[in-house]
């Protein structure tokens, strides 16, 4: 019964647990995620902005809501469905279409870094381009020719960009 909202609920538990630890500076918690993880991290940043110092989303799957709507169009959802090799319950599509991620992320005014390949066929870069127009304080780094999932050189670049972003934005 996995969905973006169940993953978000799991992340909320982790965030609360981290904030309760004496050794953790709860004013400096950064979220990062790739693909659906970037979507979920963005959702948490938008719904609980006071808990998030910074956000890094790498090829975030903002397309998944449109994909779910297309799968639902003109038919009743089956109890389970195989999507990208995963057997998912209908809650996956129901939860994905129950809100608009762009309405959520506009609530996060902290620093955000999006990293996306220009040749991503799974999640077209236009979704991240739209997101940086919606986030109050976001930057998009486009990696020329990169697809969904980076090769080693592009992955290293994304890691270095992410680390630099955290260093620049930590309190």
Identify the meaning behind each predicted range.
Residues 33-37, 41:
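Gly/Ala-rich beta-loop-alpha elbow adjacent to hydrolase catalytic centers
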């Amino acid at each position: 019964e996995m969905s973006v909202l169940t993953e978000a609920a799991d992340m909320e538990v982790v965030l609360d647990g981290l904030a309760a630890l004496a050794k953790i500076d709860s004013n400096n918690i950064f979220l990062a995620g790739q693909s659906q993880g970037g979507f979920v991290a963005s959702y948490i940043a938008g719904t609980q902005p006071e808990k998030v110092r910074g956000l890094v989303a790498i090829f975030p799957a903002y397309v998944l809501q449109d994909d779910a709507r297309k799968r639902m169009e003109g038919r009743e959802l089956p109890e389970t469905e195989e999507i990208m090799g995963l057997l998912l319950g209908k809650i996956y599509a129901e939860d994905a279409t129950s809100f608009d991620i762009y309405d959520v992320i506009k609530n996060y005014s902290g620093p955000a870094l999006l990293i996306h390949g220009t040749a991503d066929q799974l999640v077209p870069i236009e979704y991240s381009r739209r997101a940086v127009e919606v986030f109050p304080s976001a930057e998009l780094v486009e990696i020329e020719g990169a697809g969904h999932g980076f090769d080693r050189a592009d992955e290293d670049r994304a890691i270095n960009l992410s680390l630099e972003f955290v260093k620049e934005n930590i309190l």
